[in-house]
Regions:
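Membrane-interface loop-to-helix entry segments
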Residues: 26, 76-83, 129-140
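Hydrophobic, membrane-inserted alpha-helices
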Residues: 33-38, 83-90, 140-147
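C-terminal membrane-associated helical module and adjoining short loops/tails
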Residues: 2, 6-10, 15-21, 108-189
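Helix-coil boundary and interhelical linker segments in multi-pass alpha-helical membrane proteins
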Residues: 39-51, 89-102, 150-158
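Short juxtamembrane and helix-loop transition motifs at transmembrane-helix boundaries
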Residues: 11-18, 60-72, 93-98, 120-128
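Acidic (Asp/Glu-rich) catalytic motifs at the cytosolic membrane interface
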Residues: 48-89, 110-118
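A loop-to-helix transmembrane entry motif
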Residues: 74, 98-110
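Membrane-embedded alpha-helical segments that form the functional core of polytopic membrane enzymes
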Residues: 18-72
Length: 189
């Protein structure tokens, strides 16, 4: 049988290791942003962004599946994802004026989702994982970015309408149950 000092020491070691894992997870998630600048430069220079954007999205899904899903990592993931959308869409909007309406609609959806999730976090101390809804919005946004980067105004406007509709439809689930505790650290939609 272990004495109380050994138990406390082991508990402290487990907490220390858990904290180190969380810091590593947050660091790896934040590291994904480095790929965003490359994508933004490609967009600014009128070069294809599809492969780099696909790699970024695969990394996003992979880090969500592999890394610890702590509240701090979820917040970091949301910040990185939002910063990525803002950075790339900013460059696309400067280069392709026909993309601006779609970009504005997607941005409004991002703001509404972010505000809903921030409100829920403030009220309940729970972060939100958007799941399939956020994934659908991200794919629609990426589709808009890839099509806009190809420089076809008609297709860009159509892609903007589609992305706006998908983002609007996927924002609604973030509003359900907002501010009501789920009893978990991560609210999953």
């Amino acid at each position: 049988m272990k004495n109380p000092e050994q138990k406390n020491s082991e508990k402290h070691d487990v907490q220390h290791i858990s904290r180190l894992r969380e810091v590593a997870s947050v660091g790896l998630t934040a590291l994904r942003y480095s790929g965003v600048e490359y994508i933004a430069r490609q967009a600014r220079d009128g070069k294809p962004i599809g492969p780099a954007l696909a790699a970024f999205m695969v990394a996003d899904v992979a880090d969500g599946q592999i890394l610890d899903d702590t509240p701090l990592r979820r917040v970091t993931d949301g910040v990185v994802d939002t910063a990525a959308v803002v950075r790339v869409m900013y460059e696309l909007g400067k280069r392709y004026p026909e993309a601006r309406a779609g970009i504005a609609a997607v941005a409004l959806g991002q703001v509404a989702t972010g505000a809903a999730n921030a409100y829920h976090l403030a009220k309940t101390s729970e972060v939100t994982k958007g799941g399939r809804y956020k994934r659908a919005a991200n794919i629609a946004t990426a589709m808009l970015a890839i099509i806009a980067a190809r420089g076809n105004p008609r297709r860009t406007r159509l892609a903007g309408c589609i992305a706006a509709g998908v983002v609007a439809a996927t924002t609604v689930p973030h509003l359900r149950g907002i501010g009501k505790p789920t009893g978990k650290k991560v609210r999953r939609l």
